[in-house]
Structure formats: C-alpha cells, structure tokens
C-alpha cells in the first residue's frame, strides 16, 4: 500500500463504501491535483512561498499542490518514488515543481518557507499485527525524518512553519461526547497512533511555528470518502454502515486545503486545530443527504458482523465515530465555505 496524503487515518475498503481513499487516480485526474509542497520565508499572502510537502500524491496533497502552483508558489514534492510523482505531476503541466526523493529532502527543506507533512499509510485492510505496526511507523518515520531535517537546518534557512496532519482518531470514539481541541485523547489504538504522531511533530525546533491539524473525513468529488459511496448509491445499493447512528465528522476538500493554506500564511494559526466542518452529522443523515442529492434511496445498510468479518479490530473505527467541533478554527475566524453536509454534497455533485 502506498504512502498517501490523506493522513487522517482514512478508510478504503469495498465493503465500506462511505469511508474510502482511492487506490489510484487516472492520469487526467492526477494532473488536476497535487500533494507535496514547499514554502518560502516571505509572507505567504502577498509573496512567493517555497513549500515542501510530504504525502503529495494523496487526495488532500494533490489538491493543495495544485492550489499552491496555481498561485505561483514554489512547490517541492518530497516523495519516496520519483517516477510515481512525475506521473502525477508531469513537468509540462506543473512547470517549476521540484520532485525530490528522500536523499534530496534535506536540500529541499532547507530554504523553504514551510513544510507540510501529509504522509501516512492508509488504514484500509484487516489489521494484522504487522499492518498495525506499519500504520503507526509510516507516520512516525516520515514525521521524525522531516523534524530532524528542519532542526538540522541553519537558522537563516530553516523553515518558519511546520504544518503536520493528524486525525480526529486522537479523541477515540463516542456516540455521546462532543470533542474539541481541549478534549483528552482516547484509549484505543488509533488514539495511540495520533498521540505518538503528534508528539513526534512537536519535537521540531522551538523557533518554528507548529500547527497540528486533526483532520476528519474529507469529502470531495474525485476521491476520499465519496469515491465508493457514489457508485454504490447510483446502483441503488447505498446505505449506512452498521447502525448509522455513529457520528461522522467531515470536511469538504476545498475547506481543508484552504485551512492548510491559511495556516501556512497566518501566524495566528498554531497548536492543535481540528480540521472538521462546524456541523458533524450522524452517518445515516449523510447517507440520506447523499441519496437525496443523487436521486437514490439510502436503504441498504452494511451490518456490523459483515464489517467485523472483513476488518476485524479495524471495524471499530467505522462502526463507532466521534463528534468533533472546529472550535479553534472558528475562534481564528476561518471562513468555512461548507458548514452543512447538504451544501457540501450539492457542490460536489453539481
């Protein structure tokens, strides 16, 4: 399985249509998006940035790189497979983008304005002990490497900001609790992963502004959670997973990209920031709204036992959600474009 930029511990399984990260994208789709970037030491709002990005070929990363490139910022794609990155970001469509394999990361990070860390193995299969270890280590390994390179950079060419993705899995799961940035961490495996992921990012040099964005389920047209849901609904086979009463803390792709972009440029954005929309919903409501937008019923739930048979321990994350609020983003005045899932789905499907 590949390293990808969804980093929000995103699910991908055919039996789990509502929580999916695409295994691949078409060349045409890939050329529209991007995922690894570098920032300069200028004020990002009015000047050119140099942004280094890990996880650049993922769902969020591709769109983020596209945005940065369109705004004439310099982007460094930090990858473990140069050939794969070059396929997704061909030079003729993305002139000026630098693609760097791991031995070249040091030169890319030094002199960058900022670094965005979106790398991590998708949690998209039955959890064996080996898979669980890799889910954690894929995140810790890349984050530790990036932090080491930032810290070793001379002061005058050290990045000024480090934006590291994490996930709402930090809070654990609950049908009754409401979580914000001040809430304690949960006690399950994914909460443990997120705690170690975040603590690794926080080892960065004290002079670097750090933002940890706990990302929810990202909704967009060309990937993420809707990639499997939409085809299933079009076949009149859509419905919630399990009871449907579990909370679904979502965010539109455009909003999460804008939040990361704003975090790069705005010094007020630091510490933990929840990357979720202001109005989370129960999974059954999401499915009802999706069915309505597509003119299809939401009537065929996937039973608990089927998910547990396929995903084992990992089914807990699908069957038990969490209600997470973006308290810090709202305090900072971040302008969510899509606060309600109905509006988000209509925009995606229009």
Regions found by a protein language model. Give the residues of each.
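Amphipathic terminal alpha-helices
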Residues: 39, 339-350
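Mid/C-terminal beta-alpha module of Rossmann-like enzyme folds, strongest
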Residues: 45, 259, 263-313, 346-349
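N-terminal Rossmann NAD(P)H-binding glycine-rich loop of SDR-like oxidoreductase domains
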Residues: 49-71
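NAD(P)H-binding glycine-rich loop region in Rossmannoid oxidoreductase-like domains
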Residues: 84, 91-145
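Conserved Rossmann-fold NAD(P)-dependent oxidoreductase catalytic core, especially the SDR/UDP-sugar
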Residues: 130, 144-188
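Conserved beta-loop-beta element that borders a ligand/cofactor-binding pocket
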Residues: 166, 199-221
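Glycine/proline-rich active-site loop of Rossmann-fold NAD(P)-dependent oxidoreductases
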Residues: 207, 219-228, 263-273
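A conserved pocket-lining segment of Rossmann-fold NAD(P)-dependent short-chain dehydrogenase/reductase
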Residues: 228-255, 259
């Amino acid at each position: 399985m590949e390293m990808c930029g969804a980093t929000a511990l995103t699910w991908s399984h055919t039996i789990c249509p509502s929580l999916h990260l695409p295994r691949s994208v078409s060349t045409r789709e890939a050329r529209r998006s991007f995922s690894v970037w570098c920032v300069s030491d200028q004020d990002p709002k009015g000047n050119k940035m140099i942004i280094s990005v890990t996880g650049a070929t993922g769902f969020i990363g591709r769109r983020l790189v596209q945005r940065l490139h369109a705004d004439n910022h310099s982007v460094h794609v930090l990858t473990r497979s140069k050939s794969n990155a070059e396929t997704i970001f061909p030079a003729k469509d993305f002139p000026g983008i630098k693609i760097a394999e791991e031995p070249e990361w040091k030169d890319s990070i030094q002199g960058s304005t900022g670094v965005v860390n979106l790398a991590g193995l998708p949690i998209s299969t039955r959890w064996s002990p080996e898979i669980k270890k890799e889910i954690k280590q894929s995140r810790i390994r890349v984050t530790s490497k990036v932090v080491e390179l930032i810290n070793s950079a001379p002061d005058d060419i050290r990045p000024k900001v480090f934006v590291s993705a994490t996930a709402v899995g930090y809070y654990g799961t609950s049908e009754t609790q409401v979580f914000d940035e001040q809430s304690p961490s949960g006690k399950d495996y994914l909460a443990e992963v997120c705690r170690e992921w975040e603590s690794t990012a926080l080892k960065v040099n004290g002079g670097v502004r750090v933002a940890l964005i706990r990302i929810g389920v990202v909704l967009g047209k060309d990937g993420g959670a809707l990639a499997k849901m939409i085809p299933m609904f079009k076949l009149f086979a859509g419905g919630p997973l399990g009871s449907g009463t579990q909370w679904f803390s979502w965010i539109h792709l455009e909003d999460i990209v804008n939040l990361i972009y704003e975090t790069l440029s705005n010094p007020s954005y630091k510490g933990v920031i929840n990357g979720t929309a202001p109005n989370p919903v129960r999974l059954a409501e999401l499915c009802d709204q999706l069915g309505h937008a597509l003119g299809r019923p939401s009537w065929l739930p996937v039973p608990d036992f089927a998910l547990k048979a396929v995903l084992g321990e990992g089914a807990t994350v699908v069957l038990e959600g969490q209600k997470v609020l973006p308290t810090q983003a709202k305090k900072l005045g971040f302008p969510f474009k899509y606060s309600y899932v109905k509006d988000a789905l209509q925009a995606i499907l229009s």
